Amino acid sequence: MSNVPAELKYSKEHEWLRKESDGTYTVGITEHAQELLGDMVFVDLPEVGATVSAGDDCAVAESVKAASDIYAPVSGEIVAVNDALSDSPELVNSEPYAGGWIFKIKASDESELESLLDATAYEALLEDE
């Protein structure tokens, strides 16, 4: 079973979301997602300043197996991207919940968080796959 940190929120598309002290949210892909994709070779990051809607594809993770869209779990403005992934995309594999984060978003409608999964619900989703 994959590591599913209890303090995070999750999407059904295998993104995770962590609220930061400044009110923004850090987004990445889950350990389960990176295990399915395999070794990362490139991450196409979104543009800082871009406005996205929940469910929009806004980044791409390319691995030795496949290219997979990464979706915005909430609507808002992209306020930062993880530039370290340009040189070290493997951080998504080795540290999916830490150094392998993908972007930070300032949510425009925090009520959208209610549609995300908590750790227990995400674990149940994984068991059903």
Swiss-Prot record:
Belongs to the GcvH family. Gene3D superfamilies: 2.40.50.100. Residues 24-106 form the Lipoyl-binding domain. Keywords: Lipoyl. The gene is gcvH. PROSITE patterns: BIOTINYL_LIPOYL, LIPOYL. The modification N6-lipoyllysine is found at residue 65. The glycine cleavage system is composed of four proteins: P, T, L and H. The lineage of its organism: Bacteria, Pseudomonadati, Pseudomonadota, Gammaproteobacteria, Enterobacterales. Binds 1 lipoyl cofactor covalently. It comes from Escherichia coli O6:K15:H31 (strain 536 / UPEC). The glycine cleavage system catalyzes the degradation of glycine. The H protein shuttles the methylamine group of glycine from the P protein to the T protein. This is Glycine cleavage system H protein. Its cofactor is (R)-lipoate. One of its GO terms (cellular component) is glycine cleavage complex. It comes from the Bacteria. One of its GO terms (biological process) is glycine decarboxylation via glycine cleavage system.
